[in-house]
C-alpha cells in the first residue's frame, strides 16, 4: 500500500489512519470469531519459560487470524514476552504483546479486522513534528516519538500494527525489516 492508498493525518500531537474502503475480501474465519488459548503466566516459573512457551502460541494465533506478515522475527537481545493481552471485538481481534527488555517494557500490538471497511480510526499520541515514513514491501510504516519513547504504526490490508516503547528508531526499523525477511 502506498501513502495514497492508506490515507493518514496528523496534528501536532496525534497521528491517525483515515477510514478506507474495503476490497470486499473477507477471510473464511472472521477474526471476531477467534478464540486463541494462551497459557497463563502463573503456570511458569519465570518470564523466560513463559516467553519460550507462549510466543509460539502467539505466532500460531496470528497465523490463524491473517496470512499477512505482521510479527517481527527479531527483537532486541534479552527481550522476553511477559504478558499477552487479548481483546476480541465485534469487528475483529486485537492482541498486545508486552515484552520486558533492559529494565523497561515495549509492546507489539496487532489488530486484525474482519474487513478493511470495518477498520476503526485509531489515534496515536506523538511529539510535535512529522512522523518519519519508512516504506518496505510497499507498506508505509510511520515512526514517531511520544515523549521519551518511540513508536511505529502501519496497516497491511485489514491489519493494523504498532511497536511502542523505549526503543531506538534503528531498533524499530530492524524489527520492521524482520517482519518481511
Regions found by a protein language model. Give the residues of each.
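Short extracytoplasmic
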Residues: 17-42
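Membrane-interface helical sensory segment of bacterial ECF anti-sigma factor regulators
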Residues: 1-25
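Surface-exposed amphipathic alpha-helical segments
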Residues: 157-181
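Short, solvent-exposed recognition patches
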Residues: 34-147, 151
